[in-house]
Amino acid sequence: MTTRDCIHAFNESEFSRLLGMEILEARDGYSRVTMDCAGKMNPGGVAHGGAIAALADQAFGIAENCAGVHRVAVSISIHYIVPATGRLVAIAERVQDNGTTDTCRVMVYEGDRTVAEFTGVAFRVS
């Protein structure tokens, strides 16, 4: 799959459309994905943690799969730092690649505020 095909596939997936995600940039080991929090609030009036985690996971998946190598997540962790109510941007960067598994760090921002830190480990299937 080319990077262009990858971007198209992720942008057109039902999950991306459901949550209103949009890929801003993607290449092997890197992605920037955005999502508006509107309609994704918890009862406290701030972005639902599941929506934030979904955005980070989407950025992770794109960064790990946009070079024609198929990878699947084997573990993820997320640390929420501050609540959010507006447009979020997730920036994913591969920080380690040992040939079988990769580690990717995703930072989620609302403007210049860090909302969450996410770490994902991916297994190389092909």
Residue ranges and their predicted role:
Residues 1-32, 38:
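Non-catalytic linker/capping segments at the edges of enzyme domains
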Residues 61-89, 94-95:
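Hydrophobic beta-strand-centered segment that forms part of the acyl-chain substrate-binding groove
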Residues 35-37, 80, 124:
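Hydrophobic residues in beta-strands and at strand termini
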Residues 83-87, 95-126:
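HotDog/MaoC-like acyl-thioester-processing domains
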Residues 34-59:
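Hot-dog-fold acyl-thioester-processing enzymes
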Residues 17-19, 29-31, 70-76, 86-88, ...:
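A generic structural signal for short beta-strands and their flanking turns/coil linkers
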Residues 34-36, 91, 105:
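Beta-strand residues in well-ordered beta-sheet regions across diverse protein folds
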Residues 27-36, 46-47, 65, 109-110:
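N-terminal short leaders/motifs
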